[in-house]
Amino acid sequence: MSGVSYLQSLETIDPDTVTQKLRQMRLEKLQAERAAREQALLDDIDTVWQEFSDAVILGDSRAVGFSYYSFLDASRVLASSGERIDAIDGHIEDLKKLDPAYIFLCYGINDLGWYGSAQDYADTLLEKIRLLRRELPEAVIVVSSILPAYEPAVSREKLWLQIPDYTAAVQAMCEENGVLFADNTQLSEDYADLWQPDGIHLLPEFYPHWAANLIFASWGEIADA
């Protein structure tokens, strides 16, 4: 059936039903376009770094890898070993100078144990996000879920087992406050072999996949048309 014929056939249907069908058609079209856009990036994943030309990554030692392995310039990666979200305040002036369009927050592994609960951590992270929004109101903020730890790390430190709880609390906080969230759960399972032997840090081959997931999150959710 042609597009014109299809629309003519809708004339005999209840207007609310027509509206719903048209919205569904538009949503499916947008979803297909998004899927094609994502696949195009995955098919040529080394081009993902072009997407970070106006972005800054904040985070801990795992985020350091973005610059350590020369994927991104060090000026665009404000991260250091052992860093926690309480360090965000100290990056404000550098962020203002860089004036990025996107800020990716890649923290968490060092924050475990510093807060009374996963909810306390999520609440504190929200305070930092509000600070960033006040100081850099034009920037889009994306929160990366905490990447997991694997053996032998989890045998040495049981705190790592709390990562799923922290992820759930942060994701809920982001959804409630309109903050973009990059869920790395499935990605980390798919590429679990790309962790360093210590079970915490990452091999360089993981970074393009993580970067792509961050970029996908930065595009936002597809609104119900």
Predicted regions located by residue number:
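N-terminal secretory targeting modules
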Residues: 1-53, 68, 221-225
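Conserved SGNH/GDSL esterase-like catalytic core that processes O-acyl groups on lipids
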Residues: 42-124
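Conserved beta-strand termini and adjacent loop/short-helix elements that scaffold enzyme active sites
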Residues: 78-80, 144, 182-185
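Alpha/beta-hydrolase-fold catalytic nucleophile elbow
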Residues: 106, 144-145
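Charged helix-capping and loop-helix junction motifs
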Residues: 118-128, 159-166
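Hydrophobic positions in alpha-helices of CheY-like receiver
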Residues: 128-132, 174
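A short helix->loop->beta-strand "cap" motif at the edges of active sites that frequently abuts
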Residues: 136-140
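Catalytic His-Asp segment of secreted/periplasmic serine-dependent ester chemistry enzymes
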Residues: 149-225
